[in-house]
Design a protein with these regions (language model features):
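Alpha-helical protein-protein interaction elements
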Residues: 90, 121-124, 154, 165, ...
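Charged, surface-exposed helical/loop "interaction arms" that form contiguous linear patches used
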Residues: 133-184
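Sequence-level detector for tyrosine residue identity
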Residues: 15, 23-24, 155, 162, ...
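Switch/communication elements of ASCE P-loop NTPase nucleotide-binding domains
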Residues: 1, 174-308
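P-loop NTPase switch/coupling surface
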Residues: 1-147, 192-203, 300-308
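Exposed alpha-helical structural elements
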Residues: 75, 89, 101, 158-161, ...
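Short, well-ordered helical secondary-structure segments
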Residues: 16, 34, 41, 47, ...
Length: 308
């Protein structure tokens, strides 16, 4: 989130309730005296909760060391590294206790059908994680199918425990995968022409042309960068149950992308369960067919001033 203040943590600092209200305060000038008027709409719409504010000037990094999109690629790389480190710690703990846990479960009755179904499930999950570059490769070969004739009780017990451990080792990647999957789908499905986004455990994310050439992040159009920055911040940085404020998402954005914007935001909200999303926009294309959920600040504030 492109804010004025940044903590040492990669997660950017959110604005508080009072700062947001002050940012959108309404000014009325009479003679040479300036007065600030609070908006009843903003007071009612923005609860005293944690706020995430995505400003209009969002492409440039505050520290001017890297562009915002380059910082985001590094941020995703750090998330992947953290998940890998957590997975490694889980692996070490489970591997060291495997013999003892195996003896404890030796008398459990496990069917070959159950084993086979779980093997297929974990195989699919690994393939998805590898597809997005979250994990590199399968480090252990697991047979895909077993039959009642070839799978004895002792093998069932070992495999069942192994599968349970394998799933737990992959668990640190679960939430990250859901976010990456949505991020990639939103970009590849709706806005990227002649290129696609790639996820990497070496680069975070990068873009590749249809002919396989890597595209520098700085060579993306301003519209593409604006959209990517918004999606990334909402998916990977904004916190659950927070109130989201987005200022002028239409900046540099193609009209077709503007019409898709609210649908994309709805998908992100479903994943991250935001409390509320408020968007300040001048674009009827952003609103699209959703005028029933809009509030005209100019019109309503003029009415309030006339009534004073």
């Amino acid at each position: 989130l492109i804010c004025d203040n940044i903590d040492s943590d990669p997660i950017l600092k959110s604005y508080n309730h009072e700062e947001i209200l002050n940012y959108y305060k309404i000014k009325k000038i009479k003679l040479h005296k300036e007065k600030h008027h609070k908006s009843d709409f903003l007071d009612k719409s923005i609860p005293n909760a944690e706020l995430t504010f995505i400003k209009a000037q969002r492409i440039e990094n505050i520290k001017n060391e890297k562009s915002a999109i380059e910082s985001q690629a590094n941020f995703l790389l750090e998330l992947i590294k953290r998940a890998a480190e957590e997975s490694a710690q889980i692996s070490q703990r489970l591997d060291s206790t495997f013999p003892a846990r195996l003896f404890d479960s030796i008398n459990e009755n496990i069917s070959s059908t159950s084993i086979n179904d779980r093997l297929i499930g974990i195989q699919r999950k690994r393939e998805l994680f590898m597809k997005f570059g979250i994990i590199k490769s399968e480090d252990t070969f697991i047979p895909r199918k077993f039959s009642n004739a070839t799978l004895g009780k002792e093998y069932s017990t070992v495999l069942n425990l192994y599968i349970s451990d394998a799933l737990e080792k992959l668990s640190p990647y679960e939430e990250l995968f859901e976010k990456i999957n949505l991020f990639v789908n939103l970009l590849n499905e709706k806005m990227l022409a002649f290129k696609e986004i790639k996820i990497s455990n070496e680069h975070g994310f990068y873009f590749q042309s249809d002919n396989g050439e890597r595209i520098s992040l700085s060579n993306l159009s301003s519209g593409e960068q604006n959209q990517i920055v918004i999606y990334f911040d909402l998916i990977f940085k904004a916190k659950q149950n927070s109130v989201i404020l987005i200022d002028e998402p239409e900046i540099s954005l193609h009209v077709a992308w503007q019409k898709e914007f609210l649908d994309s935001i709805a998908r992100i909200q479903k994943l991250n369960e935001f409390s509320k999303i408020i968007i300040a926009t001048h674009s009827p294309q952003i609103v699209n067919n959703n005028w029933d959920i809009t509030y005209d600040l100019f019109e309503n504030n003029n009415k309030n001033m006339e009534g004073q």
